[in-house]
Amino acid sequence: MIRIVYTLMIAACAALAMPLSSSAKDGELNRAWQNAVLAAVDSFPQNGGYYTGRKSTPEFKKSAWRAFNEAYNMRLADPRPNFDPKKATPSFCSLATYGAFIQALLIWDTDGKISRMAWFNIKPLVGITDVVNEKGLNQRDGEGCWGRANANGPGFAVLVAELKAGYNFTAFRGAKTEALRESKDEKYLTDEQWCKHSIWAEAEPGDFMKIFWNRNETAGSDSGAIIGVDDNPAAEQEHGHSVVFLGYDDNGDVKYWSSNGPTDDPVNAGYGIASCPRTRIQRVVFTRITNPENFDRAASKMKFNNLNKWLDALNGKRHGTTKELLKECGIK
């Protein structure tokens, strides 16, 4: 079991004006929910394997999809799932954070605010036939709750915005290459400017976080400026990570929990705490849930095939823009 020590920043970072950023709303923090997220993270096993494939292998007898389906454990007559994080192995990042969300919602919902039908629609449909998914349906990116959370771009942020369960805030360091800049005024912030950006002081442990990796120094790629995956196999594409934000370590590096991979040793990868310098992040979207009771709206508003067309387009059709990201995430 993971035991987390949360180290917060001692001093607030200085605010820095930046065209492509938004702020957290002062005072809007549901402490009971944030604590539920941290308790949920603590309930997951350590490691368990990192695997995105759908077929069994000598290393992984079950896929992450099948394992998560078994971990959800909900029968037709059940009012809510009996979710078991220890069964949800192996895993990958978006499945890990979605699992943490489910576990947090179960911990928080002590008086049945989330209806049985909402729980049915929150369940990921991953192509496996069971009593809830009788037809063995598989939600593609942008479909229903899981299809949104698993999508390229800020999928989970879009889900929260659509259900009005919280709000999102974001910052973008800017594109380093002129070809990927969306306006003539767009600048690529220096390391010092980016590390002092006000967004780092606004984040709270228990926020969900979508990282767009900065690969300019490590891979000579400006892909951190890209949202989604287009139809050109030769083009640069999004490289991201879905995580739960935990605070900062003693060096001021971002500390987070997720299923972390791929690695050279996938069997011993998976769930755990990791950290990275702020300079490794080129764009970030934080999601703060303030009204978890509104996930009950999934009962009527998130049927299994309810499609967000923008997230669907980010899966092999076209890249998104910052303007679109702000709109879809409800950021003004």
Regions found by a protein language model. Name each.
Residues 253-332:
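Low-complexity, Gly/Ser/Thr/Pro-rich intrinsically disordered linker/tail segments
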Residues 51-52, 205, 310:
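Mature extracellular "passenger" or substrate-interacting domains of secreted, surface-exposed proteins
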Residues 119-264:
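...with weaker cross-activation on analogous glycine-rich loops/strands in unrelated enzymes
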Residues 1-5:
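Positively charged n-region of N-terminal signal peptides that target proteins for export
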Residues 23-162, 320-332:
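N-terminal capping segments
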Residues 14, 185, 190-193, 198-199, ...:
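Short, solvent-exposed coil/turn linker segments
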Residues 7-17:
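Bacterial N-terminal signal peptides
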